[in-house]
């Protein structure tokens, strides 16, 4: 400083210091005004993390109707995320939650003169927490990330409408059922080893066969078979020495057991005969498949016996064994052993099992209405073990076996149709307050319709008249009112309606009625002019009713599930979004087989409700 003072006079020095001080003050003020505001990223204060998917049910998707409450109808499909440009000034995911240039202050928000919540004010704008918005307006949102940036995505609804294919045909894909996964629903206890179809626990933890679920199981696998590529099939045993297409795996035959290839005249082929006491290790075939998990084998037992499959799993690589036993026990789980009864199997039959489903249903077994969630999955099909005395043939593992599942459902429907043409539902159903309970043995028009759609497809594939005959007899309950053990109701003494739930008073459920009409359409188109006459008459009367009554289900912002508000004089039963999209999907299908403009008009309007549109007010 002394050196500087010696060279510069004091006036100049004072001016320099003053300028320096001024610059410092200006810079300080600028830094203060540009300071970044911390924008809340803690989702509990404004954003919801969980996705729009509710996932299995209407769906049947969701868990796929609570595979979503997961009971979402499986009409909704997860859509592939598309690349999007980052939001300008958005959140930086690299630890930064600062948004430059924003100023806000906390403000009290009085809601309907009832209670107060905290909001944020920025100039003339006021922002409310999304956790409040989503509950108040019943809307949906989630934070997603694109190229390192977070973006909030808002949706008025959670369910999607599928794109209608070309005109609907009775031998084609059934609606969007290729997206249904009935067996993974938590209200499906398991796939019965004896019957080969799902056992439901929706209205009772004991489990019961629900015709709607069984028909949907068949229709979903039929539709998947049409839309998916053919499965990869690995053949492990055909008992034919000359068959070079099979894997050269050897059987292990412990002491005291027997295994040989023998001729079977009834099949005109060789088969594998085995004798292995229950107390032995059993004869075993190494498999080692790590890609596919649908196992199939032909089996004939001469005594009590079992076929077991050892699986290496994702549960710390532990081995679990699924036993298919010649009894009628439904399912059991002990330690790491899962048991399914498959019946006596004293004549040749094919056993086809989804090892993923069988493993997960076993590990998740509970005494409640829902299977316990589990993350366990098979990693490898290690080996097959046979015990008892009997024969095996055609051991394969494949990617899928859709037609086996479809025909399991079709055959069950034929075997379990009663003398009145219906599939009685053997569980009590209470639809709601004001309705009398439906006691075990009731019919459902939705079950009749979807069963007909299943049987028609089985007939068209096989030309086996037993399927068509069963479908024709299934029209009988359509003709009788609920008081006479039928499914028919009449609205305002004029419009015939086929009840999903034939309650007293009538409930007029919309989606079940439309499924019943689709079944009648499939039958009238397949059976021909003479045999299909009754189905045609029932279908035409039902379509007249639908066209007349459709406006009753429109709220101006969504749809109504049934007409209990009219029949009971209570609040309307609004359709969840997955049921709303089911209504749209059904109308889309009907619009391809009926040229009435009403269907396309309602489809257009009901689709707009999914994006928040509302009918005009006065």
From Swiss-Prot:
<dbReference type="InterPro" id="IPR039721">
    <property type="entry name" value="C5-epimerase"/>
</dbReference>
<dbReference type="InterPro" id="IPR010598">
    <property type="entry name" value="C5-epim_C"/>
</dbReference>
<dbReference type="GO" id="GO:0015012">
    <property type="term" value="P:heparan sulfate proteoglycan biosynthetic process"/>
</dbReference>
<keyword id="KW-1133">Transmembrane helix</keyword>
<feature type="binding site">
    <location>
        <position position="564"/>
    </location>
    <ligand>
        <name>substrate</name>
    </ligand>
</feature>
<feature type="transmembrane region" description="Helical; Signal-anchor for type II membrane protein">
    <location>
        <begin position="12"/>
        <end position="29"/>
    </location>
</feature>
<dbReference type="GO" id="GO:0060391">
    <property type="term" value="P:positive regulation of SMAD protein signal transduction"/>
</dbReference>
<feature type="site" description="Critical for catalysis">
    <location>
        <position position="187"/>
    </location>
</feature>
<feature type="topological domain" description="Lumenal">
    <location>
        <begin position="30"/>
        <end position="618"/>
    </location>
</feature>
<comment type="similarity">
    <text>Belongs to the D-glucuronyl C5-epimerase family.</text>
</comment>
<dbReference type="GO" id="GO:0030210">
    <property type="term" value="P:heparin proteoglycan biosynthetic process"/>
</dbReference>
<keyword id="KW-0413">Isomerase</keyword>
<feature type="binding site">
    <location>
        <position position="180"/>
    </location>
    <ligand>
        <name>substrate</name>
    </ligand>
</feature>
<dbReference type="GO" id="GO:0008284">
    <property type="term" value="P:positive regulation of cell population proliferation"/>
</dbReference>
<dbReference type="GO" id="GO:0000139">
    <property type="term" value="C:Golgi membrane"/>
</dbReference>
<feature type="binding site">
    <location>
        <position position="216"/>
    </location>
    <ligand>
        <name>substrate</name>
    </ligand>
</feature>
<keyword id="KW-0106">Calcium</keyword>
<feature type="binding site">
    <location>
        <begin position="430"/>
        <end position="433"/>
    </location>
    <ligand>
        <name>substrate</name>
    </ligand>
</feature>
<feature type="binding site">
    <location>
        <position position="202"/>
    </location>
    <ligand>
        <name>substrate</name>
    </ligand>
</feature>
<feature type="site" description="Critical for catalysis">
    <location>
        <position position="180"/>
    </location>
</feature>
<dbReference type="GO" id="GO:0005794">
    <property type="term" value="C:Golgi apparatus"/>
</dbReference>
<feature type="binding site">
    <location>
        <position position="213"/>
    </location>
    <ligand>
        <name>substrate</name>
    </ligand>
</feature>
<feature type="binding site">
    <location>
        <position position="511"/>
    </location>
    <ligand>
        <name>substrate</name>
    </ligand>
</feature>
<keyword id="KW-0812">Transmembrane</keyword>
<keyword id="KW-0472">Membrane</keyword>
<dbReference type="GO" id="GO:0047464">
    <property type="term" value="F:heparosan-N-sulfate-glucuronate 5-epimerase activity"/>
</dbReference>
<comment type="pathway">
    <text>Glycan metabolism; heparan sulfate biosynthesis.</text>
</comment>
<feature type="topological domain" description="Cytoplasmic">
    <location>
        <begin position="1"/>
        <end position="11"/>
    </location>
</feature>
<comment type="subunit">
    <text>Homodimer. Interacts with HS2ST1.</text>
</comment>
<feature type="binding site">
    <location>
        <position position="515"/>
    </location>
    <ligand>
        <name>substrate</name>
    </ligand>
</feature>
<keyword id="KW-0735">Signal-anchor</keyword>
<feature type="site" description="Critical for catalysis">
    <location>
        <position position="579"/>
    </location>
</feature>
<comment type="function">
    <text>Converts D-glucuronic acid residues adjacent to N-sulfate sugar residues to L-iduronic acid residues, both in maturing heparan sulfate (HS) and heparin chains. This is important for further modifications that determine the specificity of interactions between these glycosaminoglycans and proteins.</text>
</comment>
<feature type="site" description="Critical for catalysis">
    <location>
        <position position="561"/>
    </location>
</feature>
<feature type="binding site">
    <location>
        <begin position="500"/>
        <end position="501"/>
    </location>
    <ligand>
        <name>substrate</name>
    </ligand>
</feature>
<protein>
    <recommendedName>
        <fullName>D-glucuronyl C5-epimerase</fullName>
        <ecNumber>5.1.3.17</ecNumber>
    </recommendedName>
</protein>
<dbReference type="Pfam" id="PF21174">
    <property type="entry name" value="Glce_b_sandwich"/>
</dbReference>
<dbReference type="GO" id="GO:0005509">
    <property type="term" value="F:calcium ion binding"/>
</dbReference>
<dbReference type="GO" id="GO:0050379">
    <property type="term" value="F:UDP-glucuronate 5'-epimerase activity"/>
</dbReference>
<dbReference type="GO" id="GO:0016857">
    <property type="term" value="F:racemase and epimerase activity, acting on carbohydrates and derivatives"/>
</dbReference>
<feature type="binding site">
    <location>
        <position position="238"/>
    </location>
    <ligand>
        <name>Ca(2+)</name>
    </ligand>
</feature>
<dbReference type="GO" id="GO:0042803">
    <property type="term" value="F:protein homodimerization activity"/>
</dbReference>
């Amino acid at each position: 400083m002394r050196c500087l003072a010696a060279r510069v006079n004091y006036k100049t020095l004072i001016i320099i210091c003053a300028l320096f001080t001024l610059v410092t003050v200006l810079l300080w003020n600028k830094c203060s005004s540009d300071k970044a505001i911390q924008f809340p990223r803690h989702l509990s204060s404004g954003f919801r993390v969980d996705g729009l998917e509710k996932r299995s049910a209407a769906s049947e998707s969701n868990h796929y109707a609570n595979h979503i409450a997961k009971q979402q109808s499986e009409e909704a499909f997860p859509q592939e995320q598309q690349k999007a440009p980052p939001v300008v000034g958005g959140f930086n995911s690299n630890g930064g939650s600062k948004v430059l240039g924003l100023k806000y202050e906390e403000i009290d928000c009085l809601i309907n003169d009832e209670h107060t919540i905290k909001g944020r004010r920025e100039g003339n704008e006021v922002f409310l927490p999304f956790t409040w918005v989503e509950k108040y307006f019943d809307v949906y949102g989630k934070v997603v990330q694109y190229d390192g940036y977070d973006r909030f995505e808002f949706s008025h609804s959670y369910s999607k409408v599928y794109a209608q294919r070309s005109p609907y045909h009775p031998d084609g894909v059934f609606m969007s059922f290729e997206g249904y996964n009935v067996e993974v629903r938590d209200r499906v206890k398991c796939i019965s080893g004896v019957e080969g179809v799902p056992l439901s626990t929706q209205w009772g933890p004991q489990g019961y066969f629900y015709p709607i679920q069984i028909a949907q199981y068949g229709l979903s696998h039929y539709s998947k078979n049409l839309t998916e590529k053919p499965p990869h099939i690995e053949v492990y045993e055909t008992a034919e020495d000359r068959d070079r297409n099979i894997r050269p795996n050897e059987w292990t035959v412990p002491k005291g057991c027997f295994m040989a290839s023998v001729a079977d005249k009834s099949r005109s082929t060789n088969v594998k005969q085995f004798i292995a006491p229950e107390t032995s290790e059993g004869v075993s075939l190494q498999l080692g498949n790590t890609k596919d998990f649908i196992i199939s084998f032909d089996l004939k037992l001469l005594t009590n016996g079992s076929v077991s499959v050892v699986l290496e799993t994702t549960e710390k690589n532990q081995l679990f064994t699924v036993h298919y036993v010649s009894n009628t026990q439904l399912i059991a789980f002990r330690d790491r052993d899962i048991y399914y009864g498959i019946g006596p199997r004293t004549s040749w039959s094919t056993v086809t099992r989804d090892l993923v489903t069988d493993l997960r249903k076993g590990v998740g077994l509970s005494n409640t209405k829902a299977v316990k969630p589990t993350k366990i999955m098979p990693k490898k099909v290690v080996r097959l073990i046979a015990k008892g005395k009997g024969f095996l043939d055609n051991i394969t593992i494949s990617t899928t076996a859709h037609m086996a599942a479809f025909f399991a459902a079709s055959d069950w429907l034929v075997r379990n149709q009663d003398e009145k043409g219906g599939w009685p539902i053997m569980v009590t159903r209470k639809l709601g307050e004001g309705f009398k309970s439906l006691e075990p043995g009731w019919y459902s028009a939705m079950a009749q319709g979807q069963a007909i759609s299943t049987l028609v497809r089985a007939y068209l594939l096989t030309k086996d008249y037993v399927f068509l005959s069963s479908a024709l007899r299934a029209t009988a309950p359509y003709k009788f009112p609920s008081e006479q053990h039928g499914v028919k109701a009449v609205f305002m003494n004029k419009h015939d309606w086929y009840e999903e739930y034939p309650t007293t008073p009538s409930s007029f459920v919309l989606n079940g009625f439309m499924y019943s009409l689709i079944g009648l359409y499939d039958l009238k188109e397949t059976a021909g002019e003479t045999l299909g006459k009754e189905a045609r008459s029932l279908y035409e009367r039902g379509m007249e009713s639908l066209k007349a009554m459709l406006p009753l289900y429109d709220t101006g912002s969504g749809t109504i599930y049934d007409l209990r508000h009219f029949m009971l004089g209570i609040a309307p039963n609004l359709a969840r979004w997955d049921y709303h999209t089911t209504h749209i999907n059904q109308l889309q299908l009907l619009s391809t087989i009926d040229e009435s403009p009403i269907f396309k008009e309602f489809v257009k309007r009901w689709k707009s409700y999914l994006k928040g549109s509302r009918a005009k007010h006065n």
